[in-house]
């Protein structure tokens, strides 16, 4: 059985089949940690596209106000630094075997749709606070989730 790093979507229809796939691991006598949490889909392509549109809009806004360094890539990193933070990784030097622990910005691709919605809300609030009004297409997933929240 090849378990995805993202986990398995468990539901009534596949419970028995998953149990059969896990059983051989248990017969080896090893113990495992199982975390059960509600399933949420990974952040969507619509959310990703909106975030990149916003990085460009914020970049244009900042550059027009003299912040010439504020490229879309810089904006993306700055917002991830502020609102997502960092993850720790151990990297192994393949020649020496030395392990170096580094910190790298979290990736939006690791967020679920709810976490990405929260990130986008924080970005939008910050942008509004500096006077930058971001475009929100009426039919985009962000707007649909917002409408659902406010219903």
UniProtKB/Swiss-Prot annotation:
Misc. comment: Encoded by the cryptic lambdoid prophage DLP12.
Q: Which SUPFAM superfamilies match?
A: NinB (SSF103370)
Q: Which domain of life is it from?
A: Bacteria
Tell me its family.
Answer: To equivalent protein in phage 82.
Note the InterPro entries from the entry: NinB_sf (IPR036619)
| Residue ranges crossing the lipid bilayer per the database entry | none
In its UniProt entry, what is this protein called?
Uncharacterized protein YbcN
Which GO molecular function annotation, any one, does this entry have? single-stranded DNA binding
């Amino acid at each position: 059985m090849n378990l995805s790093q993202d986990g398995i979507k468990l539901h009534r229809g596949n419970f028995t089949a998953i149990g059969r796939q896990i059983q051989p691991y248990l017969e080896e006598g090893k113990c495992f940690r199982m975390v059960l949490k509600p399933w949420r889909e990974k952040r969507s392509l619509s959310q990703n596209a909106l975030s990149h549109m916003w990085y460009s809009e914020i970049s244009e806004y900042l550059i027009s106000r003299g912040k010439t360094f504020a490229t879309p890539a810089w904006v993306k990193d700055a917002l991830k630094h502020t609102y997502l933070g960092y993850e720790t990784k151990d990297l192994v030097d393949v020649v020496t075997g030395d392990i170096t622990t580094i910190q790298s910005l979290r990736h939006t691709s690791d967020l679920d749709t709810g976490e990405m919605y929260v990130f986008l809300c924080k970005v939008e609030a910050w942008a509004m606070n500096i006077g930058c009004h971001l475009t929100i297409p009426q039919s985009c997933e962000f707007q649909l989730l917002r409408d659902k929240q406010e219903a």
